[in-house]
């Protein structure tokens, strides 16, 4: 199993060399940007660079608005809240992910339910999700998905 996974990752990067978890890429202007940010005195959640990033994201995605977050975990947490995830809910996710995914679910007071991954894409398997839902869930009169065992909402 692991050999297949390692081969899949190496094929994506077209290399047999070491594949780092994170390899920073710098285009040469980082020192200038950091200096400009420090000189502006806006070094956290506001300032010219944050405003520019949000404008660029709106333009790129075509969305009405964009809000920069401190990190991916915070972004996932907000996204889950906006999706209606509440305390006691179950949230289907995949086990082959960064821990932030499960942490964000837990921050909402919900519980992650791990559904198998697709061997070809390494993303959540639609077939596995369908099988689990058909075996373990029902749609209530309000159109919500609930767990057969204890009626918890599945998001």
What are these regions (language model features)?
Residues 1-43:
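N-terminal "arm"/small-domain region of PLP-dependent enzymes with the aminotransferase-like
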Residues 46-90, 104, 114-116, 136-152:
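Phosphate-binding glycine-rich loop
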Residues 97-102:
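Conserved coil-to-alpha-helix start sites within the AMP-binding
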Residues 109:
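Structured binding elements
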Residues 117-132:
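ATP-dependent adenylate-forming carboxylate-activation enzymes
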């Amino acid at each position: 199993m692991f050999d297949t996974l390692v081969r899949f990752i190496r094929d994506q990067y077209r290399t047999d060399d070491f594949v780092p978890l994170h390899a920073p890429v710098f285009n040469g202007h980082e020192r200038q940007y950091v200096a400009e940010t420090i000189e502006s005195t806006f070094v956290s959640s506001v300032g010219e660079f944050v405003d520019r990033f949000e404008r660029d994201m709106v333009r790129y995605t075509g969305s009405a608005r964009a809000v920069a977050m401190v990190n991916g975990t915070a972004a996932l947490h907000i996204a889950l809240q906006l999706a209606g995830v509440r305390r006691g809910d179950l949230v289907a996710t995949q086990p082959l992910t960064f821990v932030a995914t499960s942490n964000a679910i837990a921050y909402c007071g919900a519980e992650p339910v791990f559904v198998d991954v697709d061997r070809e894409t390494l993303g959540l398997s639609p077939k596995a999700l369908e099988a689990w839902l058909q075996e373990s869930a029902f749609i209530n009169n309000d159109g919500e998905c609930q767990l057969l065992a204890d009626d918890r909402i599945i998001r």
